[in-house]
Amino acid sequence: MFIPFEDLPKSSKIWIYQSERKLSDEEVQIADEILKNFIETWAAHSTPLEASYVIKYNRFIVLAVNQEHHPASGCSIDASVRVIQELEQKFKVDLLDKMNVTYKTGEFIAHKTLIDFKKMAKEKAVNGNTIVFNNLVNTIEEFEEFWEVPAAESWHSRFF
């Protein structure tokens, strides 16, 4: 069952999917419809999940589940991956590749392979103050506090 993202407990489990490009406003509107329909019927072992999503910067899809109400199961997580794959096919983007880094350069959001980001760090094109998106955060609370952080405060720090 759909619950507004801001109404879920801060301890809710999240999954972040990033696109290598910014989605158009029209694509975001379509994604909103697909995700809302999915979440309305998302269940684990026939029990509806209290869940939500948010799309940030037209680039990141964040799914969330209130694990205190009922935890997501393997099958329900698989179902969420299938809807993400549906969006990938519809928009011709890659949302599941975790070997990429997304970071800010001023107000612009850039997307690089991990190898390219590592080279950029070595060449000092990015540094510990570069704002990165830490997609390894696990809860809404972590998302709010540690998702957009200086690289020095994230797993990205190993490159500096």
Please identify what each model-predicted range represents.
Residues 16-18, 61-68:
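Short glycine-rich or small-residue beta-strand-to-loop segments that form or flank ligand, phosphate
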Residues 3, 10-56:
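Long, hydrophobic N-terminal alpha-helical segment
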Residues 96-160:
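Terminal interaction module
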Residues 66-95:
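Helix-adjacent hinge/juxtasegments
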Residues 1-6, 89-90:
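Intrinsically disordered, low-complexity boundary segments flanking structured domains
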Residues 45-52, 94-103:
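Short glycine-rich, low-complexity/disordered patches
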Residues 22, 69-71, 104:
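Short histidine/acidic/glycine/proline-rich micro-motifs that form metal-
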